[in-house]
């Protein structure tokens, strides 16, 4: 039973933020689509787990010190994770007829990002210290989870702009990945040499 309490502690911050974003939409999205987007966000771990070992092998051979931390922060973590989140929005959410205003992208962006973050949080809370840890759940509730939510806001808004502002659609689509990668990478890199980096990055 106590394992479920740790899992609840891991996913609750993400769920609360998704609900908060959902309630900010003046014309709410279908809950079923938002929920599926959250689940697809969780499922991005399948693609991410295929790519990460390849990048790990590459980085061990070519990078040391700060260059390793830079690669690890901006490419291995930020780019890979944000790319797969963007795929959920582009190939699932934007094809729904309910996706008809910029705020919709924000809601779906938060849902996809926090779907991934919730799954990642479960792994951190249950396994990172060798035993379940509420301390890690609390720490990440104020660090990694809000980061993923913010990246989702930016990504979702810019993907919306790429659809509804046709003159700059390719630029907005590029920025929808580039800016969240920069935010995510800077966050990870800023903690790269600290004692808590393995808990919150």
What is each stretch, according to the model?
Residues 1-201:
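Hydrophobic alpha-helical segments at protein termini of multi-pass membrane proteins
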């Amino acid at each position: 039973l106590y394992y479920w309490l740790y899992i609840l502690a891991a996913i609750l911050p993400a769920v609360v933020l998704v609900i908060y974003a959902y309630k900010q939409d003046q014309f709410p999205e279908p809950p079923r689509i938002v929920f599926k987007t959250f689940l697809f966000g969780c499922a991005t771990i399948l693609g991410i787990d295929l790519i990460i070992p390849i990048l790990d092998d590459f980085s061990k051979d070519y990078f040391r010190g700060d260059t390793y931390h830079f690669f690890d922060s901006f490419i291995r973590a930020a780019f890979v994770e944000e790319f797969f989140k963007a795929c959920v929005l582009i190939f699932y959410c934007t094809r729904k007829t309910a996706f008809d205003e910029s705020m919709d992208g924000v809601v779906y962006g938060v849902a996809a990002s926090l779907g991934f973050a919730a799954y990642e949080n479960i792994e951190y809370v249950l396994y990172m210290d060798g035993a379940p840890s509420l301390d890690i759940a609390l720490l990440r509730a104020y660090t990694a989870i809000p980061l993923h939510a913010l990246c989702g806001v930016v990504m979702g808004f810019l993907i919306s702009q790429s659809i509804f502002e046709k003159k700059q659609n390719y630029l907005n689509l590029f920025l929808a990945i580039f800016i969240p990668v920069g935010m995510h990478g800077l966050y990870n890199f800023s903690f790269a040499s600290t004692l808590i980096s393995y808990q919150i990055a």
